[in-house]
Amino acid sequence: MHIATFTERPYADVPEDEVIKNASFFGVSNKFLDPVKGGALFNRYLDEKLYAEELGFDGVMLNEHHANPFTMGAVMDVEAAILARITKRVKIALMGNPLPVADPLRLAEELATIDMISGGPFGLDGFEVV
């Protein structure tokens, strides 16, 4: 059995009325983002992934959403590359690269690079990259 951890990596400092009036929860303006708080949160979420490895988790998972206060990870491949460099053993799984808006060749190169940095294999949408 393998155990992995996942969190949405939220940014909680958006006024509740702004979130509620946008029924789809997408398209919330970035005017509410404090870059200092955002940077601290990105580092905290990366540290949480390191801690998960320290606790014995087998994998960490990342997802991607845009203009959404519930997930700060708009470019999960960057986070995956950082984790590939700073983790030792844990598998990294990406859930949902938005293929319709990505250049397929560039995405393949980015993911192959992350796989090499991590020592591979690394997971994409639940499947290991081989």
Placement of each model-derived feature along the sequence:
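Structural preference for beta-strand elements that scaffold enzyme active sites
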Residues: 2-5, 58-59, 89-96, 121-125
